[in-house]
Amino acid sequence: MSRLYRILFSAGLLLGLLCLPSPITRFASVIFAALCVYAAVMQLLLRLTQHANRIIRRIASTLYAFGIAAASMIIVTFAAVQLLLLRSAHTDPEAERAQYLLVLGAGIREDRPSNTLRTRLEAARDCALRNPSSTIIVCGGQGDDEDYPEALVMKNWLVEHGVPAERIRMEDRSTNTIENIAFAKEILDRTAPAGYTTAVVSNGFHLFRARHLMAQAGLDPVAVSAPSPWHLRPVFCLREYCSRVILAATNRW
């Protein structure tokens, strides 16, 4: 068991350092740092259960059992969330007939969309070109490290790639997925005809959460699934798990 914790510590340290340089994966460094701390604490508790006096051994044994139970719960819930992500990662036939396509932001690089965001824009463009009566709503405000609102960069990309500007509306105030959808709904409630239909456009890993938030906002939980860069999928799945836990913990799920 002691060897297992040394392996976990080394793996967490290595993966954390690998994720640190990129803004896209940097958040995962915090998770892997937590793994290192967990492994170190469990290693210490294990030693105390074997070598300390009786009172310390009892306390260490209790804390060690709690650590094992917590890790088991995380593993089980993580696996369950991943199954839900897989079940949601598809395009619904109804999306082809949706009047409004909500494209969720995913970061920009100077005046160009990130690779992840580009796949969402490509999926939205293709769907919109198959349904000439649809309107695209690009969602995303301006981050502290960004020179432009994401929505503006998204609109420019779509226009450059064949979507008429008059078919695009911008929601440029939001800073997260919840606001993406909520602020887009405000625009639709003001300007769209009664009974309008919607579809959300995002990467497959993101659609479990996006569908739920769409339904929560009173919009159609219909989706267009964009492909995800294969090398980033593990990190994105980890992020979605953390987001799901945070939403549940803050009573927003």
Could you describe each region identified by the protein language model?
Residues 39-89:
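Transmembrane alpha-helices and immediately adjacent membrane-cytoplasm interface residues
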Residues 3, 23, 44, 54-55, ...:
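Short alpha-helical segments used as structural interaction elements across diverse proteins
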Residues 7, 11-14, 70-76, 80, ...:
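Lipid-exposed faces of alpha-helical membrane segments in multi-pass integral membrane proteins
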Residues 233-253:
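A transmembrane-helix-recognition feature enriched in membrane-embedded lipid enzymes
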Residues 28, 58-63, 233, 237:
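Hydrophobic, aromatic-rich alpha-helical transmembrane segments
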Residues 3-50:
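Membrane-embedded alpha-helical segments of integral membrane proteins
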Residues 79-237:
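A structural signal for short, hydrophobic/glycine-enriched beta-strand patches
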